Design a protein with these regions (language model features):
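Short beta-strand segments
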Residues: 1-3, 114-116, 141
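N-terminal membrane-targeting/pre-transmembrane regions
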Residues: 1-47
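Residue-level signature of transmembrane alpha-helical entry/exit and packing/kink sites
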Residues: 30, 34, 54, 58-62
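Membrane-interfacial hairpin junctions
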Residues: 45-57
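Transmembrane alpha-helices and immediately adjacent membrane-cytoplasm interface residues
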Residues: 58-80
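Conserved beta-hairpin
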Residues: 72-115
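Phosphoinositide-dependent membrane-docking surfaces
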Residues: 105, 114-131
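A membrane-cytosol interface segment of integral membrane proteins
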Residues: 130-169
């Protein structure tokens, strides 16, 4: 099967959002930031010799605001991705051709060709419009679910192949 599609900045940001919420790396990093946040609150309360009631108030406030850390982390990572990766690596967007077989996946653009065996992907995730084939927690191949060059029957065959690989791995 040969699929042709265009990846935009929106597609890569969607992949980054998926990675932030589903990969071990980002989950561990968010956990570490949360622990550091609590330690800093407790350290501040200890250094300022805050009375007991204020310590409980500080703990309560830190627990209430801890969900904001996840939102701040996600927003920060997306902004960093926009500034660093998308600005300096414009070859990640544009027109791509994808050759799929039972053994491998070949991703081609005007600048490069990448070959992957299906066994190289440790996770295959998806959203409504895309598949994310993770090689590592930080490197993924983003594929549109509906290629531009395929009719409905070919698209279903294309999706069935990826879903078979997703369910077998």
């Amino acid at each position: 099967l040969i699929a042709k599609y265009n990846l935009t900045e929106k597609d890569l940001i969607a992949q980054q959002k998926n990675a932030i919420s589903k990969t071990k790396y980002h989950i561990k990093t968010k956990t570490i930031y949360t622990i550091i946040y609590f330690l800093l609150i407790y350290l501040y309360l200890f250094i300022t010799h805050t009375p007991g009631d204020s310590i409980w108030f500080g703990i309560t406030v830190s627990i209430i605001f801890s969900p904001l850390l996840s939102i701040i982390y996600r927003h920060g990572m997306i902004n960093r991705f926009r500034k660093d990766v998308l600005r300096h690596h414009q070859h990640l967007t544009g027109d791509f051709s994808l050759v799929l077989s039972d053994d491998e996946l070949v991703k081609e653009s005007k600048n490069s060709t990448e070959r992957f065996n299906w066994s190289e992907f440790n996770q295959i995730k998806e959203d409504n419009d895309r598949y994310y084939l993770y090689i590592t927690d930080l490197k993924a191949v983003t594929i549109k679910k509906e290629p531009e060059n395929m009719n409905e029957k070919e698209t279903k065959e294309f999706q069935a192949l990826i879903n078979r690989k997703k369910n077998s791995g």
